[in-house]
Amino acid sequence: MKVLILACLVALALARETIESLSSSEESITEYKQKVEKVKHEDQQQGEDEHQDKIYPSFQPQPLIYPFVEPIPYGFLPQNILPLAQPAVVLPVPQPEIMEVPKAKDTVYTKGRVMPVLKSPTIPFFDPQIPKLTDLENLHLPLPLLQPLMQQVPQPIPQTLALPPQPLWSVPQPKVLPIPQQVVPYPQRAVPVQALLLNQELLLNPTHQIYPVTQPLAPVHNPISV
């Protein structure tokens, strides 16, 4: 019995070893197969790349190299440097259009025609200069000529007008009653042509008879009050 048990234990131990060896061999076989497949795949990919390089040789990118141009060295900026601040863009502010205010036109009020007052011409007064006694003494004249001049007393020359005074026509002024906000001035009429001609004749011929005057030269109008 003991011998049978020992024989069975030995057989189990051998079987376990064989099973372990078989499992390890299977693992090694699978790993080998994977390696072989990987190598085949790499070989196949390399062969395809070589085939494409042979078919399209002109399409390979070539580096652009200029014989007379040296590479420009660029300084590496540290990453902590902040970017440069750009000036803010200022948009134009729309300004309100200034409208020109039209100036108010001054209202022109029509006034009645007023006859100009004619004045009589006067002859300028001739004032002869009388030499003083001191001036006579300063002159180099003989004494017999100076004595009669010194004894003479200067007499005033009467001032006379060449034309007699003529009456001046006074322009009638309107009389307005003190009524608030209701004042109507009377219309002034123009002087007739006959009165202007008569005034011209009086100026040209002062000897013309002036008095008596039966009618006034210009009609006098009474003011109208409301």
Curated annotation (Swiss-Prot):
Mammary gland specific. Secreted in milk. The modification Phosphoserine is found at S21, S23, S24, S25. Coiled coil: none annotated. GO terms for molecular function: calcium ion binding; cysteine-type endopeptidase inhibitor activity; enzyme inhibitor activity. GO terms for cellular component: extracellular region; extracellular space. Keywords: Milk protein, Phosphoprotein, Secreted, Signal. Form 1-P is phosphorylated once; half of the molecules are phosphorylated on Ser-24, half on Ser-25. The keyword Metal-binding does not apply. Residues 1-15 form the signal peptide. It is found in: Secreted. GO terms for biological process: calcium ion transport; lactation. Important role in determination of the surface properties of the casein micelles. PANTHER family: BETA CASEIN, BETA-CASEIN. Belongs to the beta-casein family. This is Beta-casein. It comes from Homo sapiens (Human).
